């Protein structure tokens, strides 16, 4: 999953595991590629910020309820909560894709998501002359020896390939989102329809693309199919019916399994030289890779701002501080003795034992049996030998006498068992104890002695 929880902020980008998101409470979606939506589904129930086009795709494809989707206009600054301002910038990657420029007490952070650098980005007012404290960079093509042409040059290569095969049907392998611009360019260049599946046609209309797509077989020379369909066996079967060439527009290394499969270096990610140009122009204080792994940091270090040693304090917002302090406090608390002992004995089924107070004191009436400090709600008798405690829960107004005496009922509440049911003066807290718990040997011995004490003389 290509997502990030940004440290020192309440921000998570393309990260949809709430359980692992820590204190993040502001969730952003950069674009709708599947590797950036892992964990995002129709059950999502928190505000989610994205571009308007991504918002439409999100509801259409993943059925995320619209009440949780917060579309933000691209090119404008938006106050999100009380601590963060965000500006969405075109990422030049796929329809609806954006970069996020975050500003707050944590400094200024640019999160590129997946992006293809263009010199036009240097004319973006939100970035021009801006100090960037942290740059989260798409390092997909961070390979010094991996040169890539611009997308316009790659599209020209595809057109030249098609011209060399005038009698062939052309099948182009694409993912569920992306390469739409290439398909439109080729359709207009050759004056033909692009045949697609019904679901893809529905998405093309949602994206409001030019009307060059159809589902009618045989209506056009160019077909757009899922990239997984471009393989040896399908090429064999297609060429039996009609001469066919396949095009894979990708900047990634791919193993070609058929002589009629052609790779065109059309990439929606920045090349290594473009990344260097972008970082050199931006001069961030630090660079952090979005795609985990080797990101050739040394290649960018020389372009960092000379102020990179003077980063602003990455203060944790108050809601995060409270959460961290509470977690720290709970971790430092010592477990009471009975919790430790409970692991050594099976707890009687159907009985719930409340946690004891940390301090216990010796009871005068029972040898070897201790009682914890009592509060106004409950009394308890514990055997330290067996690690078992028994409780007598009462209304707040009930109070206990000295050990060995009977419990007196308060004026505002009554015990569930009256004195008339038990002619002896045996304390009720023992009579209400579960019988299977009373089988503990040391406690039974103490009870036996207690019964002997109260036998009529």
UniProtKB/Swiss-Prot annotation:
CDD domains: apollo_TRF2_binding, SNM1A-1C-like_MBL-fold
One of the Pfam families matching this protein, by short name: Lactamase_B_2
Subcellular localization, as worded in the UniProt entry: Chromosome, Telomere; Nucleus
UniProt motif (TBM) ranges: 425-437
Primary residence: nucleus
Coiled coil: none
GO biological process: double-strand break repair via nonhomologous end joining; interstrand cross-link repair; protection from non-homologous end joining at telomere; telomere maintenance; telomeric 3' overhang formation; telomeric loop formation
Keywords linked to the UniProt accession: Chromosome, DNA damage, DNA repair, Exonuclease, Hydrolase, Nuclease, Nucleus, Telomere
A GO term from the CC aspect: chromosome, telomeric region
EC code(s) of this entry: 3.1.-.-, 3.5.2.6
Reactions performed catalytically: a beta-lactam + H2O = a substituted beta-amino acid
SUPFAM superfamilies: Metallo-hydrolase/oxidoreductase
InterPro entries: DRMBL, Metallo-B-lactamas, RibonucZ/Hydroxyglut_hydro
GO molecular function: 5'-3' DNA exonuclease activity; 5'-3' exonuclease activity; beta-lactamase activity; damaged DNA binding
Top-rank lineage group of the source organism: Eukaryota
Assembly with partners or alone: Interacts with TERF2; the interaction is direct.
Role noted for this protein: 5'-3' exonuclease that plays a central role in telomere maintenance and protection during S-phase. Participates in the protection of telomeres against non-homologous end-joining (NHEJ)-mediated repair, thereby ensuring that telomeres do not fuse.
Family under the similarity heading: Belongs to the DNA repair metallo-beta-lactamase (DRMBL) family.
Domain notes: The TBM domain mediates interaction with TERF2.
The name this protein goes by in its record: 5' exonuclease Apollo
């Amino acid at each position: 999953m290509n997502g990030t929880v940004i440290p020192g902020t309440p921000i998570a980008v393309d990260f949809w595991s709430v359980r692992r998101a820590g204190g993040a409470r502001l969730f952003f979606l950069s674009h709708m590629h599947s590797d950036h939506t892992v964990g995002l589904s129709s059950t999502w129930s928190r505000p989610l910020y994205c571009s308007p086009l991504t918002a439409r795709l999100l509801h259409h494809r993943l059925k995320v309820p619209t009440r949780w989707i917060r579309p933000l206009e691209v090119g404008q600054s938006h106050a999100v909560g009380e601590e963060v301002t965000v500006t969405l910038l075109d990422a030049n990657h796929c329809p609806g894709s954006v970069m996020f420029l975050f500003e707050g007490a944590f400094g200024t952070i640019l999160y590129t998501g997946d992006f293809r650098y263009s010199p036009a980005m240097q004319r973006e007012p939100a970035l021009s002359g801006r100090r960037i404290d942290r740059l989260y960079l798409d390092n997909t093509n961070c390979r010094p020896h991996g040169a890539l042409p611009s997308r316009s040059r790659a599209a020209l290569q595809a057109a030249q390939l098609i011209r060399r095969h005038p009698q062939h049907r052309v099948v182009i392998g694409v993912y569920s989102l992306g390469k739409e611009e290439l398909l439109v360019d080729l359709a207009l260049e050759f004056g033909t329809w692009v045949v697609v599946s019904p679901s893809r046609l529905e998405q093309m209309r949602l994206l409001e693309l030019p009307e060059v797509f159809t589902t009618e077989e045989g209506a056009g020379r160019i077909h757009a199919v899922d990239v997984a369909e471009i393989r040896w066996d399908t090429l064999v079967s297609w060429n039996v019916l009609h001469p066919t060439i396949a095009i894979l527009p990708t900047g990634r290394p791919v193993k070609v399994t058929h002589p009629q499969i052609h790779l065109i270096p059309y990439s929606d990610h920045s090349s290594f030289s473009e990344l260097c140009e972008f970082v050199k122009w931006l001069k961030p204080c630090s660079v952090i890779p979005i795609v985990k792994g080797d990101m050739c940091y040394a290649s960018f270090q020389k372009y960092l701002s000379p102020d990179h040693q003077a980063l602003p304090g990455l203060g944790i917002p108050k809601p995060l501080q409270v959460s961290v302090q509470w977690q720290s406090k709970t971790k430092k608390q010592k477990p009471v003795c009975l919790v430790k002992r409970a692991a050594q004995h099976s707890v009687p089924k159907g009985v719930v034992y409340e946690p004891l107070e940390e301090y216990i004191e010796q009871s005068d009436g029972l040898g070897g049996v201790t009682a914890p400090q009592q509060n106004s709600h409950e009394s308890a008798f514990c055997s330290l030998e067996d690690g078992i405690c028994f409780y007598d829960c009462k209304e707040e107004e009930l109070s206990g006498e000295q050990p060995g005496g009977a419990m007196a009922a308060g004026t505002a509440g009554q015990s569930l068992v009256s004195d008339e049911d038990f002619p002896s003066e045996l304390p009720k807290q023992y009579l209400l104890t579960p019988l299977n718990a009373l089988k503990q040997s040391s406690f039974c011995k103490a009870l036996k002695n207690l019964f002997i004490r109260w036998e009529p003389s």
